[in-house]
Amino acid sequence: MRVVVLGSGVVGVTSAYYLARAGHEVTVIDREAGPALETSFANAGQISPGYASPWAAPGVPLKAVKWMFQKHAPLAIRLDGTQFQLQWMWQMLQNCTSSRYAVNKGRMVRLAEYSRDCLQALRAETGIQYEGRTGGTLQVFRTQQQFDGAAKDIAVLQEANVPYELLSPAELARAEPALAAVSHKLTGGLRLPGDETGDCQMFTTRLAALAEELGVKFRYNTPIDALAMAGDRIAGVKCGEELVRADSFVVALGSYSTQFLSGLVKIPVYPLKGYSITAPIVNEASAPVSTVLDETYKIAITRFDDRIRVGGMAEIVGFDKSLRQARRETLELCVNDLFPGGGDTSKATFWTGLRPMTPDGTPIVGRTPVPNLFLNTGHGTLGWTMSCGSGQLLADVMSGKQPAIKADDLSVHRYLGEVGGAHRPAYA
């Protein structure tokens, strides 16, 4: 089967790789000059199935009000004047109940755990290198309330059989030695020893090269204008004056998927803006050894070979990609507070990206009401974590194989008023 994949971020490239492995003839099209040059370029770097959680959670609405008045708040909202933004935020609020949170987190952990298994198999088979580490991840708490609140997440972890360790302040240094110097600031931590880290952009670039060896064709610097219909099916994708034809099409355009599919399939994927800095390591003993997540600032601090990546925060501000100095100051504050002297933040590079977020936090992977149109988008802050599993799952669905995990609640049909009701989404 001839397949066109639209988008060459980590989700698009993994889709192409697994489709090619399944025997399909794959072409990837992207407007950028190479793979992983947008949202996948400088993300936080962690592969964290156990921390796969929706932003829509109990207590978040009240926290959001408080964050409006805080300088270093992890969430910011600026109305962009669109009805879609208001609809998306309303649907997100509806998912902030305990029952919806449990369902959504369960879905996310299921896919994320499977994705890590797929990544490990891929690594064993290909030997792909991306400055990866398998030292687990550590969430640190600054208040007793945060520490006590971890019980809800632990219940979900136990249900999913995810190994974990709840650590006291004195035990944190066992996982991250440099935290010994600042343990008095912390009330404890939740460690997931099965989590991993790595450079997403490096991984995507090298996987694209492996995909090319399997016969995948990459067309960069190519405009992606619209899908052309023939009856109830996609005939091709319009790229400037050219119509690129195929048997099936995969939309993996991240935050741009919603507008691209407008009038065809309505999906609730909204850009959630995030930031990162990448600083050179200047003192090994004061630097992290894996990933540390600061629960207060919602920031992840990740160790690469000779760099520290600090990323996080969320802004609901539309497609604004301006770099706000105040956000850089928050990232620097967090890493310098937990790992003083570990990295030189004065020499850090500053970046922003738009994560494609659904209101329930779960990505959209699989079939659509259009017979030969498939989606792999909406992974939010977990595109790197979920990429391999999403790509393998999609390849199985498109190849007529039974996926290794439950997949029906991951497709766009969970938003539709009825199967086939492409213009009657439940969130509208």
From Swiss-Prot:
- Give the species: Paraburkholderia phytofirmans (strain DSM 17436 / LMG 22146 / PsJN) (Burkholderia phytofirmans)
- GO CC annotation terms, alphabetical: cytoplasm; plasma membrane
Catalysed reaction(s)?
a D-alpha-amino acid + A + H2O = a 2-oxocarboxylate + AH2 + NH4(+)
Its keywords, alphabetically, are: FAD, Flavoprotein, Oxidoreductase
Its cofactor is: FAD
Pathway assignment: Amino-acid degradation; D-alanine degradation; NH(3) and pyruvate from D-alanine: step 1/1
Gene Ontology molecular function: D-amino-acid dehydrogenase activity
| Family matches, as Gene3D superfamilies | D-Amino Acid Oxidase, subunit A, domain 2 (3.30.9.10), FAD/NAD(P)-binding domain (3.50.50.60)
Q: Which family does it belong to?
A: Belongs to the DadA oxidoreductase family.
Domain of life, per the record? Answer: Bacteria
Protein's name according to its UniProt entry: D-amino acid dehydrogenase
The UniProt entry's GO biological process terms, in alphabetical order, are: D-alanine catabolic process
Gene behind the chain: dadA
Q: What is the protein's known function? A: Oxidative deamination of D-amino acids.
Residues annotated as binding FAD are 3-17
EC no. given is 1.4.99.-
